[in-house]
């Protein structure tokens, strides 16, 4: 029997389809059964949808974006560091359980249940001797950062999702190199995907001066990174153990308003005081999870006695990610919203939370709480942008006021309630930040800071458009289609 070329193609196509079917079947089994404890039901269904619609392409996407790193791979070499803070956490938990909150601060007493919940995290010990300044403009922020680097005496630790070596990045790198020449310890931890244009070779001069650099989840293969799903989205600076920074600004010219999105509106905190110990602890834990050289452990020089009374702003630092036992920041946000009596002000560039978070916001609004949500008017990630808008209908119907920021790009991640307390940090209000990425937020029980940030929010409203039920209902059919498609896959964005 003679075989034609078309017969061969048909046979080959059949074999490819069979292989694709088997791969999809195996992958579906893995997603449903083997990873059920590390994946939500909505995420499971979203991945099954992708595999069904895009059989072979879906498999490739899963290799890059679907796998979650086991916690045991991230918690190595940290026993000694954690042990030194276990006693403090245990003591505070026991005191709170007895109704002894250890402070006269009214907001800590009022929100003692939130404080108690955050104490369940290894970074979450409560500190009160703190002074907090806030920044909403990148130029102001990095002018202060560069001044603080210049004034450093012993060491500087930086941990960033994006460390772009453009104009701003070079200024910071040169400032750090000057401190190395003065004999200071300087360490940089950057995310390999968030800083994708950065190569380790870019730091050769920095390292020749004694600086240390690590890339978080660096790929061993060029152009291929199979750990893209779990990224270090944290932004932390610690200087001399006396002051620290945490918030939404990355390092790069874009965050000074020089990118295609225009003015960059974000929120960042500068903290002086005991809460810096928690930021230092977080940096050490993250560094130790990636470092190829000998680890560094608890040392009094990294947790020094602070320079006298600094302020009275109680702070807890909360970190979450694949290595965490539970979703600390998401639950912190949710607890704040559910405890609000008067007002809630939310800002997030990506708003794709799960139903429980959406329901908390709806319940607050239906209970008479004045709830505000601010999101971007322009996309930096189109699919995420449409998924964000897909949640608007339910929220508007519940009485939530939604604003689209028109004066550039809103990148701030903030939850503020009752002009009493606020959470600021790196966590967006979406599935990726709540479950997949490594994030860090400060929960600050400070009326002055809360009121200052509410004033900034009200100024942002003057630069925004309010989204109404009428305008949302009249959006084009093409927009409705994009939102529906984005909503289907939103749990895996």
Go through each PLM region and give its residues.
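Catalytic-core elements of nucleic-acid end-processing and repair enzymes
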Residues: 413
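N-terminal localization/anchoring segments of enzymes in phospholipid and broader phosphate metabolism
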Residues: 1-331, 335, 339, 379, ...
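Histidine/acidic-residue-rich catalytic or RNA/ligand-binding cores of hydrolases
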Residues: 356-358, 385-387, 417
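Short alpha-helical functional segments enriched in proximate histidine and acidic residues
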Residues: 347
């Amino acid at each position: 029997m003679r075989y034609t070329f078309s017969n061969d193609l048909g046979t080959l196509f059949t074999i490819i389809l069979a292989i694709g079917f088997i791969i999809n079947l195996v992958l579906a089994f893995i997603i449903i059964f083997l990873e059920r404890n590390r994946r939500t039901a909505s995420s499971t269904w979203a991945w099954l949808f992708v595999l069904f619609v895009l059989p072979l392409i879906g498999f490739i996407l899963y290799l890059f974006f679907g796998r979650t790193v086991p916690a045991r791979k991230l918690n190595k070499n940290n026993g000694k560091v954690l042990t030194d803070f276990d006693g403090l956490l245990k003591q505070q938990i026991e005191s709170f359980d007895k109704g002894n909150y250890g402070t006269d601060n009214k907001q800590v007493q009022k929100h003692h249940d939130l404080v108690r919940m955050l104490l369940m995290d290894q970074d979450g010990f409560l500190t009160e001797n703190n002074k907090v300044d806030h920044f909403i403009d990148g130029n102001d922020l990095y002018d202060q950062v560069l001044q603080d680097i210049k004034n450093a005496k012993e060491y500087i630790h930086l941990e960033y999702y994006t460390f772009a070596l453009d104009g701003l990045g070079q200024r910071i790198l040169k400032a750090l190199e000057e401190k190395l020449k003065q004999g200071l310890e300087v360490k940089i931890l950057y995310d390999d995907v968030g800083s994708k244009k950065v190569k380790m070779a870019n730091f050769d001069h920095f390292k020749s001066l004694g600086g240390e650099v690590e890339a978080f989840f660096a790929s061993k293969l060029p152009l291929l990174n199979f750990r893209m799903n779990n990224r270090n989205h944290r932004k932390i600076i610690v200087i001399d153990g006396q002051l620290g920074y945490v918030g939404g600004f990355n390092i790069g010219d874009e965050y000074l308003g020089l990118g295609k999105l225009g003015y960059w509106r974000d929120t960042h905190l500068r903290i002086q005081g005991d809460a810096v110990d928690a930021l230092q602890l977080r940096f050490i834990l993250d560094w130790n999870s990636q470092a190829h050289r000998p680890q560094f452990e608890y040392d009094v020089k990294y947790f020094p006695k602070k320079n006298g009374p600094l302020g009275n702003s109680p702070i807890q630092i909360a970190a979450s990610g694949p290595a965490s036992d539970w979703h600390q920041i998401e639950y912190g946000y949710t607890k704040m919203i559910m405890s609000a009596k008067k007002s809630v002000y939310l800002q997030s560039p990506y708003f794709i939370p799960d139903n429980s978070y959406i329901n908390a916001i709806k319940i607050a609004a239906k209970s008479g709480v004045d709830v505000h949500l601010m999101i971007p008017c322009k996309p930096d990630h189109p699919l995420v942008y449409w998924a964000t808008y897909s949640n608007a209908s339910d929220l508007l119907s519940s009485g939530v006021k939604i604003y689209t920021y028109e004066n550039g790009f809103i990148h701030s991640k903030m939850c503020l309630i009752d002009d009493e307390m606020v959470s600021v940090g790196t966590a967006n209000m979406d599935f990726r930040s709540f479950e997949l990425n490594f994030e860090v937020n400060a929960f600050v029980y400070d009326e002055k800071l809360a009121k200052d940030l509410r004033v900034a929010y009200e100024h942002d409203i003057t630069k925004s458009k309010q989204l109404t039920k009428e305008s949302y209902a009249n959006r084009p059919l093409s927009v409705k289609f994009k939102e529906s498609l984005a909503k289907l896959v939103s749990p895996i964005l």
